């Protein structure tokens, strides 16, 4: 009886299989890479969504404290320095807790603190276009839900002496719709007469314009919202109609 066992390793009887220990090392190394990558991504998300929000919240607290102090002492700065607070923004559609100090400037350093006013555009309540940029997904994401704004929605600004109520709507006499999606290079949305080709045209209306990145987590486009000033009242007269029932705290 022939008890010869055929070789198992190929034509020449050589076994080419790698040692089990080698595969374990490969699998372990790959697993460690995935774990490390996952931790890096997690830390990035924590930084983007939590830490940036923490720093902005701290900055907002400092801004409102300074602004309230200046207002209490009758201080109005005609040409506010970059990064300083100029007005308090409230949007009823976003709820009674929504409040942000708008800062002067739109640089990275400015927008870390909160929504920023484009220098060179009108100031709150003035004739022209008070244009404001803001983040949608980081630094407390003040414009996260900007896409939810609808025609007829009120937007309220608080200055030292007045309540300014703007109403989201198409801008008469222009092609500017109340909500638009444009390219990042389309700066005409912030002109005194928005969406016109001539930046030197003098404005005749009191406009508010918001700009932010679109879609969320992308800078491929800009989402724009326009509004018109529809009411201006002294703060001594009490809260404006749009804020009826509000109990204002902090900002």
Segments the model singles out, each with a brief description of its role:
Residues 58-76:
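Short extracytoplasmic/periplasmic juxtamembrane "stem" segments immediately C-terminal to an N-terminal membrane anchor
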Residues 1-63:
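N-terminal membrane-targeting segments
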Residues 96-148:
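Structured, soluble extracytoplasmic/luminal domains of envelope-associated proteins
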Residues 94-97, 161:
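Glycine-centered tight beta-turn/hairpin loop motif at sheet-sheet or coil-to-beta transitions
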């Amino acid at each position: 009886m022939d008890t010869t066992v055929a070789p198992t390793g190929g034509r020449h009887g050589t076994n080419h299989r790698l040692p089990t220990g080698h595969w374990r090392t490969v699998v372990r190394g790959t697993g460690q890479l995935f774990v490390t990558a996952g931790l890096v991504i997690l830390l990035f998300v924590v930084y983007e969504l939590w830490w940036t929000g923490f720093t902005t919240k701290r900055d907002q607290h400092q801004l409102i404290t300074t602004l309230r102090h200046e207002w209490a002492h009758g201080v109005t700065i005609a040409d506010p320095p970059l990064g300083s607070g100029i007005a308090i923004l409230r949007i009823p559609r976003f709820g009674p807790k929504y409040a942000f100090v708008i800062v002067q400037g739109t640089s990275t350093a400015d927008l870390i603190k909160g929504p920023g006013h484009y220098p060179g555009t009108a100031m709150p309540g003035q004739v022209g276009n008070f244009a404001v940029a803001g983040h949608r997904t980081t630094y407390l994401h003040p414009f996260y839900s900007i896409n939810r704004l609808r025609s007829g929605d009120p937007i309220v600004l608080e200055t030292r002496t007045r309540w300014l109520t703007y109403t989201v709507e198409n801008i008469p006499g222009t092609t500017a719709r109340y909500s638009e999606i444009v390219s990042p290079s389309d700066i005409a949305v912030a002109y005194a007469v928005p969406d016109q080709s001539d930046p030197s045209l003098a404005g005749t209306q009191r406009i508010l314009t918001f700009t932010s990145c679109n879609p969320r987590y992308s800078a491929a486009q800009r989402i724009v919202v326009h509004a018109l000033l529809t009411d201006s009242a002294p703060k001594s007269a009490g809260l404006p109609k749009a804020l009826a029932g509000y109990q204002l705290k902090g900002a």
